[in-house]
Amino acid sequence: MTLSKLLYLSAIDYLNTKSKGGAHLNLTYYIVATIIIAVIAVYVDYYIRKNVSAAKISNAEEKGRNIIEDAKREAESKKKEAILEAKEEMHRLRNDFEKESKDRRNEIQRLERRIIQREEALDKKGDMLEKKEESLNKKHQELENKKSNIENLYEKQREELERLAGLTSDQAKEMLLEEVRKEIKHETAMLIKEVETKAKEEADKKAREITTYAIQRCAADHVAETTVYVVNLPNDEMKGRIIGREGRNIRTLETLTGVDLIIDDTPEAVILSAFDPVRREVARIALEKLIMDGRIHPARIEEMVEKAKKEVENNIREEGEQATFETSVHGLHSELIKLLGRLKYRTSYGQNVLKHSIEVSYLAGLMASELGMDPTLAKRAGLLHDIGKAVDHEVEGPHAIIGAEVAKRYHESSIVVNAIAAHHGDEEFESIEAILVQAADAISAARPGARRETLEAYIKRLEKLEEIANSYEGVEKSYAIQAGRELRIIVKPEVVDDAGSYEMARNMAKTIENELEYLVKLR
């Protein structure tokens, strides 16, 4: 609080006191006293402020002079330090420059010495090269002279040889070339024989390993199917009931099933004979149901035959599903599964086609695994390779082509379709899976006991083998042995030599392969 304010407040307090003590003072006196006090307070305040400001200004000026003096002294000190540092830096730079200059002079001198040494070495090499060139030129001239002498000598000897032999050089060359051609031809034939024999041995060894391993892991226990089936009867009296009055029961059963019922003197047995296994199976089931039921008459026979047909259809579907389950082949179309089931009632040379297809699927998958391939496609193609046999009595054409068309219709992959079509050579192989399926098919078919062959067909096959062998020029005699698995040929030595016999064997093998269908390897 300033002095004027204190005086003003003191005056107010004084007046208030006076007013309380003497109420008789008038208002004018109060106002005049207040103004006087206020003027005095303002003047005193102004005087005090002026003295205080002057003191502050004086102090500030003194501080400013001190600061300026300090700054001048500090600037002078900094200036001296900067001059000293600059002198030191100049001295250091001068030393560095002198050192670097000295190093560069030394390096230049070293390079100059190396250049001088290289120039001296190059001069020496140049002198040596000049000497070598002179020596080579001299030797070249000597060789040219010797070459000229040799050519002259060769010409004289050639003329002397032509005179003595009575042949020109061209005639002699032709004779020599002819001899060389014969020798090269013979050596080429022997080399081809050696290479091909070695390649066949290696291929046969590897193929035997793969097929042996596959066969060892795939043991089939089924036997050849027959075209007849024997139904056991509880007693011989049942034969008369099956025949019926005037033979109407047996005629009805034969008409509805298409199967021949043979009732002879065989005790307690009826023979069902039919080439269609599906019809034979329908007749068997129907007859067994009739025997169990005991009521045998045309109406009942018709009813049982219908039930048997439905049961066979169910069995066909179940057999197809079981085949896919056994071989782990999934995702087949329902129609393909049904066709697979129908193969159970088809045979090929007495071999059950469904069992054969399962066996081929196993073998193809195992061989694919041995080759480091994914066995899935090989097993799928092997299972479906004979699918055409389930429909080939309805559609004309080879069963391989029919099967390929069926597989294609039900969206099988191109690899599977080609494997089916090519497994009998009707189309070219487009994949390794197709080759494996053909090999597995041949293994399954050639397995001992898998298929039957009639005596007449066997004899004709042996005669055809010997006929093909005897048709070649130079063959004296031929023998088909080992059940037609080996063909031994005796040739005339004056007509066929060793190399020619090898070529004859190759051509004969191709002829047999083209003209005969073989399930085994022929030696």
Swiss-Prot record:
Report which residue ranges the record marks as coiled coil: none
How does this protein sit in the membrane? Single-pass membrane protein
Query: GO molecular function terms here?
Result: RNA binding; RNA endonuclease activity
One GO cellular component term, please give it. Answer: plasma membrane
Q: Which residues form the KH domain?
A: 227-312
Q: Tell me where the transmembrane regions lie.
A: 28-48
Q: State the source organism's domain of life.
A: Bacteria
Family matches, as Pfam families? HD, KH_1, RNase_Y_N
Query: Which compartments does it reside in?
Result: Cell membrane
EC main class here is hydrolase
Q: Which Gene3D superfamilies match?
A: Hypothetical protein af1432, K Homology domain, type 1
User: For this protein, what is the EC number?
Assistant: 3.1.-.-
One biological process term from GO is: mRNA catabolic process
Keywords, sorted A to Z: Cell membrane, Endonuclease, Hydrolase, Membrane, Nuclease, RNA-binding, Transmembrane, Transmembrane helix
By its UniProt entry, which NCBIfam families does this protein fall under? HDIG, RNase_Y
What does it do?
Answer: Endoribonuclease that initiates mRNA decay.
Q: What is this protein called?
A: Ribonuclease Y
